[in-house]
Regions:
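Short intracellular "coupling" helices and adjacent cytoplasmic loop segments at the cytosolic face
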Residues: 47-48, 83, 91-115, 119-121, ...
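A short amphipathic helical element positioned immediately N-terminal to and/or at the very start
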Residues: 1-11, 113
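Helix-loop-helix
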Residues: 49-53, 144, 148-165, 176, ...
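An intracellular "coupling" helix at the cytosolic face of ABC transporter transmembrane type-1 domains
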Residues: 11-14, 99-103, 119-132, 136-140, ...
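Transmembrane helix-loop-helix hairpins at lipid-water interfaces of multipass membrane proteins
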Residues: 10, 16-73, 77, 150-155, ...
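ABC-type nucleotide-binding domain
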Residues: 325-583
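Hydrophobic alpha-helical transmembrane segments of ABC transporter permease domains
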Residues: 21, 25, 29-33, 58, ...
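Juxtamembrane helix-loop junctions of ABC transporter transmembrane domains
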Residues: 21-22, 29-42, 63-110, 114, ...
């Protein structure tokens, strides 16, 4: 895990190497100060030698200045290395997430990925900075101070050893269980972020159903769970300071009592006893810094583990060994396809699906909620892979294509329309970033979006808020259809993408498709039969199985589900949910 993380230091390796070097040298300078002070007392003050006082006083000042300079440099390079390291981690995670399939995203959840890229990376950044400085400075302090203590005090140095053993035992008893608690803490962060994200993104629904109280209660429960875990962890960590103070006071009492006897018997000088007090504080401060570092490491270890999970996750859509670089045409074939979601119920949502679509043909797909209409079409641009069977586009298995090539030729308007902050032109050019304004206007007219765009004061330069919150549902759908058309794809998939559009506009869009893009294979998922009845063929899905396939007229004669829904819709307000099974 550590090797994986450190590999992302990149251009900040130099700063990461210089930081511990300067921190170690700073610690050495600090350790020299008590010995120099001992010379000032023994050679200067007790003997009344002003020259010795000035000489060793100047040396003390120079050592302190050098230590200060080294500390500043260590701090500068530590900040540079840790900040750059965190940036590289976020970049690497973000880049890897871009290659995830929908199944990979389902595994972590959106809120979980956000937590890992923000809170978890910040924890690792802080821990890395502390490791670079304290975890180098403190051990150097500890080793050199112990060495100097043994050199000066001899048997008195056993006091230091007892203190070190005591504190190491206490720290070990605290840290081991605390690590597991922090692992649960960050899982609770995921739940908290999910609650916030869901509430904010659906705030209009929350308010319209007067569910503020329920959402507040749900958020409070998530906060309380996080609070309880943190209190549990901090309660254990709270033993750290009392243990440290016990060691400090115990060492001071023991050293004062035994040290005074050694001075009276002439075994050590007053200056050396003073130096021993300085070294014992050095040792205990080093242990305190290490304990703080261990606390930070305990928190960040769980975060580091979660970050590595994201970095190690590989897409479950493996690339083809010899990828096909061109889609010949828009012909589509499903051959005995079965599919299930890896992180779902484990039951197949599509069962033994077999049918084909000719290039340029229009296929309508209808079925009840949970009949797997969206799941079916998501296999065409390879957003998921089939569990068994084969999906072909242009006569080639979709798994044999270069994924970018395939998706450039299969343009899909998802059921959940997404617009990004930027102008209307910016959003349309997601389909083709090099498209001219004239091309954008042309596809907007095909999608019947031009009529409302022209009513905006800034027309195509009108600013769209994040998520398209300042346009209506129907307007959003027409903009996303126009965006898909701008790619000039061989296959166009509309996943219930005209549900918020009135029937007259829906008819205009379908007419424009027939007249302007006859060579493009079109797949239209809809609840309204009027949206698909002009299609060359209509596929009826029921509980993940094909219940019927034919023209509008053929299905009216042969398919019971289609007949009943057609009759209910022509008589008023019928839909497929009355026939379609629940998934």
């Amino acid at each position: 895990m550590i090797k994986k993380l450190v590999s992302h230091l990149g251009e900040y390796k130099r700063a990461a190497v210089l930081t511990p070097l300067f921190a170690a040298l700073e610690a050495v300078m600090d350790v020299l100060l008590p010995t120099i002070m001992a010379f000032i007392i023994d050679q200067g003050i007790e003997k009344g030698d002003m020259n010795a006082i000035l000489k060793y006083g100047l040396l003390t000042f120079l050592v302190a200045v050098v230590a200060l300079a080294l500390g500043v440099l260590a701090g500068k390079y530590a900040a540079e290395a840790s900040t750059g390291f965190a940036g590289n981690l976020r970049d690497a995670m973000y880049e890897n997430i871009q290659h995830y399939s929908f199944s990979n995203i389902d595994k972590f959840s959106t809120a979980g990925l956000v937590t890992r890229m923000t809170t978890d990376v910040t924890n690792v950044q802080n821990a890395f900075q502390m490791i670079e400085r304290m975890c180098v400075r403190a051990p150097v302090h500890l080793v050199f101070a112990l060495f100097m203590g043994v050199m000066i005090g001899g048997p008195l140095s056993l006091i230091f050893v007892v203190a070190v053993v005591f504190l190491v035992a206490v720290l070990a008893g605290i840290m081991v269980p605390t690590f597991h608690i922090f692992d649960r803490v960050f899982k609770n962060y995921d739940a908290l972020n999910a609650s916030v994200q869901e509430n904010v993104s659906a705030i209009r629904v929350v308010k319209s159903f007067v569910r503020e109280g329920f959402e507040n209660e749900k958020y409070t429960k998530a906060c309380q769970s996080l609070y309880d875990q943190f209190v549990n962890a901090e309660s254990r960590l709270s033993f750290n300071n009392p243990a440290m103070l016990t060691a400090v006071y115990g060492c001071n009492i023991a050293l004062s009592w035994l040290g005074a006897k050694y001075v009276l018997h002439g075994a050590i000088t007053t200056g050396q006893l003073n130096a021993l007090f300085g070294y014992i504080m050095n040792i205990l401060m080093a242990l305190m810094m290490l304990s703080m570092a261990f606390v930070m490491i305990s928190m960040s270890a769980a975060s580091a583990k979660r970050i590595v999970e994201v970095l190690d996750e590989t897409t479950d859509l493996p690339p083809a060994k010899q990828p096909v670089q061109q889609v010949k045409d828009g012909g589509i074939e499903f051959e005995h396809v079965t599919f299930k979601y890896k992180h779902g119920s484990g039951q197949p949502v599509l069962n033994d699906i077999t049918f084909s679509i000719k290039p340029g043909e229009t296929l309508g797909i209808i079925g009840g909620t949970g009949s797997a209409k969206s799941s079916l079409v998501q296999l065409i641009p390879r957003l998921y892979d089939a569990e068994s069977g084969t999906v072909k586009v242009g006569g080639v298995d979709v798994r044999d294509y270069n994924l970018d090539v395939l998706r450039r030729e299969v343009s899909m308007v998802l059921q959940k329309n997404v617009l990004f902050s930027g102008t209307i032109l910016d959003n349309l050019r997601w389909g083709d970033e090099n498209a001219s304004e004239e091309e954008c206007i042309r596809v907007a007219k095909l999608a019947c979006a031009d009529e409302f765009i022209e009513r905006f004061p800034n027309k195509y330069n009108t600013w769209i808020e994040q998520g398209g919150s300042n346009v209506s549902g129907g307007q959003k759908q027409r903009l996303t259809i126009a965006r898909a058309l701008l790619r000039k794809p061989k296959v166009l998939i509309l996943d219930d993408s005209t549900s918020a559009v009135d029937t007259a506009t829906d008819a205009k869009i379908r007419k424009a498709f027939r007249e302007e893009i006859p060579g493009t294979t079109k797949i239209i998922i809809a609840q309204r039969i009027s949206s698909v009845q002009d299609a060359d063929r209509i596929l009826v899905l029921d509980n993940g199985k094909i219940d019927g396939l034919g023209t509008h007229e053929e299905l009216l004669k042969t398919n019971a589900i289609y007949q009943e829904v057609y009759n209910s819709q022509t008589q008023g307000s019928g839909d497929f949910d009355k026939q379609g099974g629940e998934q």
